[in-house]
Swiss-Prot record:
It comes from Schizosaccharomyces pombe (strain 972 / ATCC 24843). This is Putative monoglyceride lipase. Belongs to the AB hydrolase superfamily. Monoacylglycerol lipase family. The gene is mgl1. Its EC number is 3.1.1.23. The modification Phosphoserine is found at S301. Residues 276-350 are annotated as: Disordered. It is found in: Lipid droplet; Cytoplasm; Endoplasmic reticulum; Mitochondrion outer membrane. Pathway: Glycerolipid metabolism; triacylglycerol degradation. PANTHER family: PHOSPHOLIPASE-RELATED.
Length: 378
């Protein structure tokens, strides 16, 4: 396994409720949005992060090696290691992926070696297909696949513009100025990403973990219809799809105060799936246990912060390992003294840690008239 840069955000305000392994998107790195991880810490959620091979501080060889991953076969072993690294706790463990990372999270929930260790999967604007305006046709995809086998590390610019990432102009400018954020990647990573997404949709009936998918309606990078398709076909009976009107691609770094509403909604889902429960064996996947079936239904409702919410979820059976003894804490309103954040470049045998302190805005409770369309089918 290649050396991978890792950074763990464990400075929670009070008692930790859950732990998340976060997978960043294409062309990004985990230090690109520290305020997001700090906001999760404010909600008593620990976060373990890493720069994927070929990106950020895990990139080897400078800009000429941007997005050179070595191939799809190496990605899951990297993720196996990150999940094992984060499993040294009684806290329930969740896998949260954004964009390219969201597609990886869904695929790992289907066939990942350690998926039984997960209490649930959160796929944010997952890369299953490109937005219809940019989705390559069949012939172009076929050509890309063939050429990538001959010249896997040939660099290609996806031409994703920073202004399409979030409505927060200050964040867009910061991403544009960040030398480690780039729209360039290897032909191999593009080919793998597109082909993996198509196959993941086909395999949706084999997904049996608790599932939350979130997508912005104004995302013009990835296809929200594909997210909905995966949700509808997923084998799990514990699944929720949330659609946020007006949100761009990166929901976790959207403009304030709407981003706080978003994080509150996702945190509430994590809290709900962090409660201890009875278990029975799943017929579909005997290696995974799930809580005793329950059935509830709900109509579109308003969120606690007053933002109209349309949410669709279906929750009759949760097919994940029951979470450990962890009780949800209320969403804190302000920051407090915290444990140090650990940052390292890792190999499987060693984790080198140094203390860092991340400064970001606390996540206040929000009262706003903006809409957040979320669909709940229980």
């Amino acid at each position: 396994m290649a050396d991978l840069y890792t950074k763990d955000w464990t400075d929670v305000k009070d008692k930790p409720v859950a732990r998340v392994v976060f997978i960043h998107g294409f062309g990004e790195h985990v230090n690109a949005y520290p305020e997001f991880f700090e906001a999760l810490n404010e909600r008593n959620i620990e976060v373990y992060t890493f720069d994927q091979r070929g990106f950020g501080h895990s990139r080897k060889g400078g800009p000429k090696k941007q997005g050179c991953t070595g191939g799809w076969s190496l990605v899951f072993p990297d993720l196996d290691y990150q999940i094992l690294r984060a499993s040294d706790t009684e806290l329930p463990l969740f896998l949260w992926g954004h964009s390219m990372g969201g597609g990886l999270a869904l695929r790992y929930g289907i066939s990942g070696t350690h998926r039984h260790k997960l209490a649930g999967v959160i796929a944010q604007a997952p890369m299953l297909r490109c937005h219809p305006d940019t989705e390559p046709n069949f012939l172009l995809r076929k050509a890309l696949t063939l050429v990538s086998k001959v010249h896997p590390n040939f660099l290609f610019d996806s031409d994703v513009q920073s202004q399409h990432i979030t409505r927060d102009e200050a964040v867009n400018q910061r991403l544009q100025d960040d030398p480690l954020v780039s729209s360039v990647g290897s032909l191999q990573v593009f080919s793998d990403m597109l082909n993996r997404g198509t196959k993941t949709i086909e395999l949706a009936p084999q997904f049996f973990l608790p599932l939350l998918i979130t997508h912005g309606t104004d995302d013009n990078v990835t296809c929200s219809d594909s997210s909905k398709e995966f949700y509808e076909n997923a084998g799990t009976k514990d699944k929720t799809y949330q659609s946020y009107p007006g949100f761009y691609h990166s929901l976790h770094i959207e403009k304030k105060p709407e981003v706080y509403e978003y994080l509150d909604k996702v945190a509430a889902w994590i809290y709900e799936h962090s409660k201890p429960s009875e278990t029975v064996k799943s017929e579909q996947e005997t290696a995974v246990e799930h809580p005793k079936p329950t059935a509830t239904t709900s109509a579109p409702s308003a969120s606690p912060t007053g933002v109209p919410v349309e949410e669709e979820s279906h929750k009759a059976t949760s097919d994940a390992v029951p979470p450990a003894e962890a009780k949800p804490e209320p969403v804190p309103a302000s920051a407090a003294e915290r444990a140090p954040t650990s940052e390292s470049t890792t190999v499987p045998e060693t984790i080198v840690a140094s203390t860092t302190k991340v400064i970001s805005e606390p996540a206040p409770r929000v009262t706003t008239a903006a809409t957040a369309d979320i669909v709940t089918n229980k």
